[in-house]
Swiss-Prot record:
A Gene Ontology molecular function term of the record: oxidoreductase activity
Pfam families named in the record: CCG
A single BP term in Gene Ontology: lactate metabolic process
Family note: Belongs to the LutA/YkgE family.
Disulphide bridges: none
Organism per entry: Bacillus cereus (strain Q1)
GO cellular component labels: cytosol
Full protein name: Lactate utilization protein A 2
Amino acid sequence: MKVSLFITCLSDVFFPEVGKSVVEIMNQCGVELDFPEGQTCCGQPAYNSGYQEDAKLAAKQMIKAFEHSEYIVTPSGSCASMVHHYYKEMFKGDSEWYEKAVHLADRTYELTDFLVNVLGKNNWKSKLVEKAVFHQSCHMSRALGIKEEPLKLLSQVEGLDIKELPYCQDCCGFGGTFAVKMSSISETMVDEKIKHIEATEANLLIGADMGCLMNIGGRLRRKNKNIQVLHVAEVLAKGLSK
């Protein structure tokens, strides 16, 4: 099986360890992994800001970059949902690019979705002794319907005690450009999220979208909270049996 890694902007610039963890995970699974160098931003920031033509340019570049990929895996529910839902929306009036967008979406998977529903992983060999909570990101859980897959994988990590996070379905307040345009509302939302995390007495927050982790993690640091933040890929790669 051949898999192409769609790294995303946030992993490339802010969370390189997440990308490295995905590589370790795929190696453990015996998957042949490549990295198409022509990939770029998926176009979501431009699309959400109303710059349709700029978003289309980014989408076309992504479609070209992954044209020959068998499977495309990304450690981001947000970017995966952009490819799955909004590429087709952008190219509705262009039959050629619409078909290409559909073809790309059909081969694109969020990481935990791929591990559980394509590779059928049910006995993950990693270890991390921590008390943790899992944050359900909006795009991943609502747009893609991926809720149980990350929890199923995390339940297989030796030593990891996952506590139930109150109001886990609530947005953390990031929302891409929302956090910039409506910063005061965003701050209130992330403070509420932190309050619920603290109520569990967990010392580790796990998530599957780096935008959420950047937002919550940044707020935790600003408030001097001693709670570690990790992407699910980093957790799955911890103490991985070689």
